Amino acid sequence: MERLAKRLDACQEQLLELYEENSRDLQKHIEHWKCLRMEAVVLYKAREMGFANIGHQIVPTLETCRAKAHMAIEIHLALETLLQSSYGKEPWTLQETSNELWLTNPKKCFKKQGRTVEVIFDGKQDNAMHYTAWTYIYIQTVQGTWCKVQGHVCHAGLYYIVENMKQFYCNFKEEAKKYGVTDQWEVHDGNQVIVSPAPISSTTSTDAEIPSTGSTKLVQQVCTTNPLHTTTSIDNHHADCTDGTAYNVPIQTSPPRKRYRQCGQSPSQHLQHSNPSIPSIPSASVDPGLCGVRTNSENCNKRRNHCGSQATPVIHLQGDPNCLKCLRFRLKRNCSHLFTQVSSTWHLTENDCTRDTKTGIITIHYYDEAQRNLFLNTVKIPSGIKSCIGYMSMLQFI
């Protein structure tokens, strides 16, 4: 009994010294786990001999002592092999070598520089969960060697790539089954928002299918006030967007001036879908493997003249009223600097004053085409919502 008490006191005294030192040397953390390993062995032996306590120290059950000893041995051996690798010279903290982080997903590997990723389910702000994404993950291969990989975030979940294979340690689809109803979610990683991949369609009859691989370019003609040509390109440019579309929320800048439309034209002549003589944007089904990034360099509309009356660029979005309401809420919260106004949900009625209550329309107003192009470059239109760009002249009275 006395010998066990002396050994336990020696282990705990050394542990206190290591805690006070708070070293960033991996060798010190190996000594720390060696002491914990010895402490678990002493307590296990004391319980095996029938002692309920050693001095003022209560001896846990055999199962608890055995589990602590196994954990200490496992981490101690892992740290010793890590010390022999090229990462042994890196600074390490007690927290980064703790058993809590060792058992945190991804389990049984070391992790550094964690950050919080927020996932909002069903488009409801009060239905959000937080997950930890790791910047660097240290994986031990089957051969026993250590490799350092970077952690990634996509719409599908949190993952890292080792030996050209994606390894997910958090699957958002499984989380959506637990916390959501509609199987829809969006990921907020810092100032980056990743939404579910979905096709974008317009009210025109022309369809353009975009391939799912490679870098593709979709050329479109857009009506503007300058006799130029518009080119819209959609590229696979980000590895993390293979399971979703990411966009960054840009810094707010001062709005540009309004522009003027041709005299004598009615508002309906400025809506692309109602004027067959004006080229329209073909709808494009965006493959989940593509990240939509539009860059406008030219545009064409030689039929428009310059005149004193104002024409405000707009985008009409048509779809389920609830989806439009959620989209309007997200736009006001994250992208309010990318447009001037957004309407409430409105409907088109037939001659008999009936209307289709299953679909609604919202109209987004912009200062000019430049701000509208910035909006298109930044915001991903959700699934099931049709879009149509145009101009409205009555906004000068608002």
Swiss-Prot record:
Region (Transactivation domain): 1-201
Ranges annotated as biased composition (Polar residues): 263-275
Superkingdom per UniProt: Viruses
Record GO cellular component, one term: host cell nucleus
A biological process from GO: DNA replication
Residue ranges of the region described as Disordered: 256-280
Coiled coil region boundaries: none
One Pfam short name: PPV_E2_N
SUPFAM superfamilies, per database record: E2 regulatory, transactivation domain, Viral DNA-binding domain
InterPro entries listed in its UniProt record: E2/EBNA1_C_sf, Nucleotide-bd_a/b_plait_sf, Papillomavirus_E2_C, PPV_E2_N, Reg_prot_E2, Regulatory_protein_E2_N, Regulatory_protein_E2_N_1, Regulatory_protein_E2_N_2
Example of a GO MF term: DNA binding
Subcellular location: Host nucleus
Post-translational modification: Phosphorylated.
Positions of region (DNA-binding domain): 311-398
HAMAP family: PPV_E2
Subunit structure: Binds DNA as homodimer. Interacts with protein E1; this interaction greatly increases E1 DNA-binding activity. Interacts with protein L1; this interaction enhances E2-dependent replication and transcription activation. Interacts with protein L2; this interaction inhibits E2 transcriptional activity but not DNA replication function E2. Interacts with protein E7; this interaction inhibits E7 oncogenic activity. Interacts with host TAF1; this interaction modulates E2-dependent transcriptional regulation. Interacts with host BRD4; this interaction mediates E2 transcriptional activation function.
Similarity field: Belongs to the papillomaviridae E2 protein family.
Function summary: Plays a role in the initiation of viral DNA replication. A dimer of E2 interacts with a dimer of E1 in order to improve specificity of E1 DNA binding activity. Once the complex recognizes and binds DNA at specific sites, the E2 dimer is removed from DNA. E2 also regulates viral transcription through binding to the E2RE response element (5'-ACCNNNNNNGGT-3') present in multiple copies in the regulatory regions of the viral genome. Activates or represses transcription depending on E2RE's position with regards to proximal promoter elements including the TATA-box.
Name of the molecule in the record: Regulatory protein E2
Organism: Human papillomavirus 42
Classification of source organism: Viruses, Monodnaviria, Shotokuvirae, Cossaviricota, Papovaviricetes
